[in-house]
């Protein structure tokens, strides 16, 4: 379990992980690490929340929220944001399925991807700022949001097919079991409830339903999921959870 956690941490974040703790795992062990995704999110969100908390007395709520979002982007290396941009470039191109997947594979940023990044990042700053004004603890809010966002992404893996022939997403999509799916989601919901009480539970359940709907819509449009759509689900899951806290 410990090796799985550090494997997941090295896979979906830029935090340094000693090689002895994350290397030498079989493919099946990487797939089993999905259940630790909410714990990785918990850690990343707690660090970003701590940044916002420490800066708030010095620079005020708006800038504290901005630097909290920036910290989260740096901690993940923009990994999930890149997936969000690629997904929106493809989906909103209104082309054929194959052409959408080609566009998503293109490393260049398009108009729709740029707009999606602006919207999501600005929305996160505004929502976190509003939560700070309402005296919601930033560490609890961001830790819970990141845990739930990564926990609910499993909904785009279980009983879905990979839309391409190869890629990083193929490691998880269609490869997770029902038990892994339930444990991963339950962990995200439980962490949100522990950190934020009934408000966190409500926000987590709302996020669950909306991310399930997102997965269904993407499946109909693309014929399956990709690593990019998983990244999009994580980013949107975080934002939806934070919005549901308001």
Swiss-Prot record:
Pathway: Cofactor biosynthesis; adenosylcobalamin biosynthesis; adenosylcobalamin from cob(II)yrinate a,c-diamide: step 7/7
Keywords: Cell inner membrane, Cell membrane, Cobalamin biosynthesis, Magnesium, Membrane, Transferase, Transmembrane, Transmembrane helix
EC annotation from Swiss-Prot or TrEMBL: 2.7.8.26
Catalytic activities: alpha-ribazole + adenosylcob(III)inamide-GDP = adenosylcob(III)alamin + GMP + H(+); alpha-ribazole 5'-phosphate + adenosylcob(III)inamide-GDP = adenosylcob(III)alamin 5'-phosphate + GMP + H(+)
Pfam family for this entry, one: CobS
Any GO BP: cobalamin biosynthetic process
Membrane topology: Multi-pass membrane protein
GO molecular function: adenosylcobinamide-GDP ribazoletransferase activity; cobalamin 5'-phosphate synthase activity
Listed cofactors: Mg(2+)
Transmembrane stretches, start-end: 34-54, 59-79, 113-133, 138-158, 171-191, 194-214
Location in the cell: Cell inner membrane
GO cellular component: plasma membrane
NCBIfam families documented for this protein: cobS
Protein role: Joins adenosylcobinamide-GDP and alpha-ribazole to generate adenosylcobalamin (Ado-cobalamin). Also synthesizes adenosylcobalamin 5'-phosphate from adenosylcobinamide-GDP and alpha-ribazole 5'-phosphate.
Recorded family membership: Belongs to the CobS family.
Designated name of the protein: Adenosylcobinamide-GDP ribazoletransferase
Encoding gene (name): cobS
């Amino acid at each position: 379990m410990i090796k799985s956690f550090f494997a997941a941490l090295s896979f979906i974040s830029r935090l340094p992980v000693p090689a002895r703790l994350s290397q030498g795992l079989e493919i099946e062990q990487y797939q089993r690490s999905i259940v630790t995704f909410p714990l990785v999110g918990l850690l990343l969100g707690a660090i970003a929340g701590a940044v916002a908390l420490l800066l708030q007395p010095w620079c005020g709520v708006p800038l504290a929220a901005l630097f909290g979002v920036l910290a989260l982007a740096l901690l993940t290396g923009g990994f999930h944001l890149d997936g969000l941009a690629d997904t929106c470039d493809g989906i909103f191109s209104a082309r054929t399925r194959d052409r959408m997947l080609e566009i998503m594979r293109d490393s260049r940023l398009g108009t729709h991807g740029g707009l999606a990044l602006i919207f999501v990042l600005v929305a996160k700053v505004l929502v976190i700022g509003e939560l700070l004004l309402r005296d919601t603890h930033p560490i609890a809010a961001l830790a819970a949001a990141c845990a739930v966002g990564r926990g609910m992404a499993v909904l785009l893996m279980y009983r879905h097919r990979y839309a391409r022939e190869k890629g990083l997403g193929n490691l998880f999509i269609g490869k997770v079991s029902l038990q892994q799916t339930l444990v991963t989601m339950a962990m995200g919901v439980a962490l949100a409830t522990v950190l934020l009480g009934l408000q966190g539970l409500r926000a987590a359940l709302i996020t669950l339903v909306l991310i399930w709907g997102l997965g269904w819509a993407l499946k109909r449009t693309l014929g399956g999921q990709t690593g990019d759509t998983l990244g999009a689900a994580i980013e949107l899951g975080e934002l939806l959870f934070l919005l549901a806290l308001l």
